[in-house]
Every structure is written in structure tokens, then in C-alpha cells.
């Protein structure tokens, strides 16, 4: 699976009574699907995945899988601390049409951060049995943890571990990871223009076949339905796929170093603004990319500061449904809302 470009960390909308607002989630995903972002990440670390029940997780994954455009890469975050629980979510994600899962270290046992053998066992056991490829999550802030270079290099050799999102990525750390995983080479299926081929694209191609109508079985004329043209695919060789998961405004140096793309928090409420930073670089105009990055820097920093409550209010301002965070997280104060309104005024959504 090709992982690159801008990925959006989806929020989970809640109604005022605290239930998942699935219709609003469906609308949000449909709108993100009209944007030029490459992928959507559900229930990622740092969001509210840990507040969801098992049935809510199943509902959220199902709605996203049904609402997303087929060409958008779908990645499901796993907020479970056991191998069994993680695999249950991976199975749900596969059934919903997702393309990969995002796996972070267990958060219930801080002592694991000092025990590489147990960490390796957790990640490897999930990767062994997961029906979907695994992306690793690394973040030095609680409750997650930054994965050591040695552990990343070990896990990258696993055939079902295809890359990582790194919230602390610097040019130096990226180069160290790239060097440690330089022997990893895999073929992925892409379109004629080297865009990802998702599982839902392949499923649609299998379903679009020529068939004979039921009426023709009664002796009438057969009616053949011509299949849609199949998606033309080719293969591309990729290494261990590394995505930045920090501020959008700091993306350019990482892209210049070779990072495949990014998962910026700001993309949830301003996907177009984040994409323009990436697109300008891909178009060979780093000066324009730097200019675009400066335009979003203040909004970017504020989203990092205010967290999910700030992102959700930003979504409300920019045409998505954010709503309130789920308790015990608090909504923004009036002063904080004014700050978000001020910085998002010039950021394209």
C-alpha cells in the first residue's frame, strides 16, 4: 500500500447527549473526499479514540468506509493495549474497506517503554495476524512513546509493517530512520499516475463485470451491461514509508529530505491549506511552499496548543462538523474560540 501525500486526522463528532453523531461523520468524510488530500486516518492517537466503546468503533469504521471516496487511502487507528483487542479492531477495519491500521505502543503499562522485547512482541504479534498492513505510531509525549531507532529498524523488516507516522520527526531523525531501514524494499500497486490503489478501488473493479439481466432468463433478448474500464495499474518500489505527524508549517524541510507526506493536526479543519504546502513542493516550487507554510504557521501552532477541542471548533468554522469534545475533555472558552477564529480567517479550508 502506497502511503504518501497529506493525510487528514479525522475527528469523531458527538451529539449533545454524548452519542456518536454518525450522520455528521458521514458528511465530514464526504467533504474531505472532495479535497485533494491523499488519505484519511480514523481514530488516530491524540484524538478521542480511547473514549469509544467497541460498538462505537465498529460504527465509526463502517460509516467512514462507506462515505469515503474510493481513491482515498483509509487508515484505522488502534487504541487497544492487548494483541487480541488490537486484532479485533484490525478485523473491523478490514471489513469496512480500510487499507492499513495505525498501531501505537500500549499506554496502560509505562514500564513497557523500557522493555524493548515486550514492545517488539506486541507490535510483531499484531503485524503477524493483522489482515491489513501496519503503520507504526511514534510520539514522545504521553500517553504514547517515541519508538527507538533499534526497534523501528527491527519492526521495519516485518513484511506486514509498511511504515510509520512520527510526531517528533526532524530531518536528523528521518535520515537516521531511513538509514536504519535502507534495506527494506517493497512493491506496491499504484495507478498510471502513481497514485495509491486502494482496496475499495480494487473491490469496485471486481464488481464491475459484464452480466446478463434476469429478464433474459425468461426467453427474451439478453441484455449485456458493459463493464467500466478497469483501473490501469503498475507497480512502484518503495522503502519503509515515513510520514511526518507534526506541525504542517515545519513540513518543507522534511519533504526536501525525502519524507513521503504528512499527517498534520491542522488538516482536520484546513485540509486545503495543508495540501497547498505539499503541492507547491511537489510542483518544484519550494519558495512557494515555504510561503504557504508561513501562512498556516500561527493556526498550526494554535491547533497543537488547544488539541482536539481546538481542532473541532476549527472544523465548525470551516464547514465541517466538529462539535464538542467528549467529557472529560472541556470545550474551548470564549477567549480560546476568539483566538481560533482570528487565526483561521486567512487559512483556506
Where are these regions (language model features)?
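A non-catalytic, amphipathic alpha-helix used as a structural packing/dimerization or gating element
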Residues: 24-27, 31, 59, 63, ...
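Structural signal for hydrophobic packing residues in well-ordered secondary-structure cores
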Residues: 14, 33, 68, 72, ...
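A general structural signal for well-ordered alpha-helical segments in protein cores
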Residues: 57, 61, 86, 174, ...
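Generic alpha-helical structural context detector
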Residues: 8, 279, 312-316
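Catalytic alpha/beta core domains of metabolic enzymes, predominantly
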Residues: 125-128, 140-295, 300, 304
